[in-house]
């Protein structure tokens, strides 16, 4: 009985060093492919947040105009925040994300700019000049500015 157990323990084998190294190499290759992909996702998310935020600010600017007989002259970051409390202004919110970095108004139009978080740094701007609306993106880092700088 004891001899059988000894024989069985000699017959059992584990993984060889080569097999373990191949598995580690495969895991390393997969990580090298996946990690850069995941890191870029934060930049894309911050860009999407900035685009959504500048659209919200645009709606607030239109509300300000409606309240002021069609004039956009009082459009400022603080005025946008007074209309929509969820609009962060002036600096990046705690925990990261986008914020309204600039907002100016004239009688017949306005310009509102949102800056994506530090991982992207891109700025997204909506300008309304006498009813003609343009959207532009300025590259501040990596992320989602299209080639023609319009979004």
Question: Whereabouts are the PLM-identified features?
Answer:
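N-terminal leader/signal peptides at the extreme start of proteins
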Residues: 1-15
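Hydrophobic side chains within alpha-helical segments
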Residues: 22, 34, 44-45, 61
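N-terminal single-pass transmembrane signal-anchor helix
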Residues: 11-38
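Residues at secondary-structure transition points
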Residues: 12, 44-48, 52, 94-100, ...
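Aliphatic-rich helix starts adjacent to a transmembrane/signal segment
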Residues: 37-54, 68
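Periplasmic/extracellular, small/polar-rich flexible segments of pilin-like filament-forming proteins
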Residues: 59-151
């Amino acid at each position: 009985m004891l001899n059988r157990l000894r024989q069985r323990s000699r017959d059992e084998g584990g993984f060889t060093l080569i097999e373990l190294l191949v598995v580690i190499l495969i895991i390393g290759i997969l990580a090298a492919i996946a990690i850069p992909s995941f890191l870029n996702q934060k930049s894309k998310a911050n860009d999407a947040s900035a685009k959504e935020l500048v659209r919200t600010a645009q709606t607030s600017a239109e509300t300000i105009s409606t309240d002021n007989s069609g004039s956009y002259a009082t459009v400022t970051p603080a005025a946008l925040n007074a209309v929509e409390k969820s609009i962060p202004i002036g600096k990046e919110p705690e925990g990261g994300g986008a914020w309204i970095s600039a907002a100016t108004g004239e009688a017949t139009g306005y310009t509102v700019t949102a800056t994506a978080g530090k991982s992207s740094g891109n700025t997204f701007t909506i300008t309304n000049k006498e009813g003609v609306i343009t959207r532009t993106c300025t590259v501040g880092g990596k992320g989602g500015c299209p080639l023609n700088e319009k979004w």
